[in-house]
Amino acid sequence: VLPLKRLGAAKSRLEHPGRALLALAMATDTAAAAAAVGRDVVTGVLLVTNDPAASAAITAQAVDGGEVAKDGPAGQGHGGWAPVLAVPDLPDRGLNAALRHGARVATRRWPGHGVAAMSADLAALRPAELRAALLAAPPTGRAVLADAAGTGTVLLCAAPGSELLPRFGEDSHALHVRSGAVDLTGGLAASVPGLRRDVDTVVDLAAARLLGVGPATSAALATAAANAG
C-alpha cells in the first residue's frame, strides 16, 4: 500500500523547483520497483491517492515493471509483475487513515495475504531490497523497518490475520516497535539502502541520487534542470 498526497501538497519540505513533478516521479519509481519484486511475494500494489492525474500516470507507467526495475527483471523469475492499482483516499484524514483504508481494500481484494505499507518516495528502491525485507518479516504479527535516519518508518508489514495499525509521523519507528512490531532494521542494516532512503529534503534527494534513482525520477530531474537553465 503506497499513500500519495495530492501533488500540489506533496513533499512540502522538498525545496526544489520541480517538487510536484518529482513527487509523481518518485511514486512512479517506487510503485514500479514494488511491482517488480515478483508475484510470489508481492501479489499487488495499491496506490491510495486523491490525485486523479497521479493515479492515472502511475498505474499506466507501472504496468510494465521491466521498464522501471533498476536491478533487472526480478519479477520474471518469481511469478511475474504484480498489478498496480489505485483507489481514492476516501477518509481523506491524513496518512494513517489513508493506510488503514488501503489495508482494508487490499485485504478484500487479495484475501489471505499480508499487507505492507511503504513510503512512496523511495526514488532509489531496488526490487531485490524490498523482496529481502518482505521475506525477512515474520509469518505472524507485524514488522517494521526504519528509514535511513533511524527514526522514521519506510516499511510496515502485517502478516495475514494481523492488523496493520500504522503509526506514521514523528518518531514512528519507535512507536511501531513499542506497539509490538518486530524491528527488521538491525538484521537488514546496510543491505537495503534504497529501501531506507526516503526523500523529504534536497539533502535526502542528493543521497538518493548517489544510490541511483529510477528512470522516472531521473527524467524529472533532467526536466527540472532544463527548465531552470
Predicted regions and their residues:
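A short, N-terminal amphipathic alpha-helix
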Residues: 23-41
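N-terminal nucleotide-binding beta1-loop-alpha1 segment
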Residues: 1-13
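Conserved donor-nucleotide/metal-binding helix-loop-beta segment in metal-dependent transferases, i.e.
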Residues: 125-149
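Conserved alpha/beta core of the MobA/IspD/sugar-nucleotide pyrophosphorylase nucleotidyltransferase superfamily
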Residues: 171, 177-229
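Short, glycine-/small-residue-rich phosphate/pyrophosphate-handling segment
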Residues: 156-181
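Short beta-strand/loop segment that forms part of the nucleotide-sugar
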Residues: 42-51
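Short phosphate-binding loop-to-helix
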Residues: 57-114, 172-175
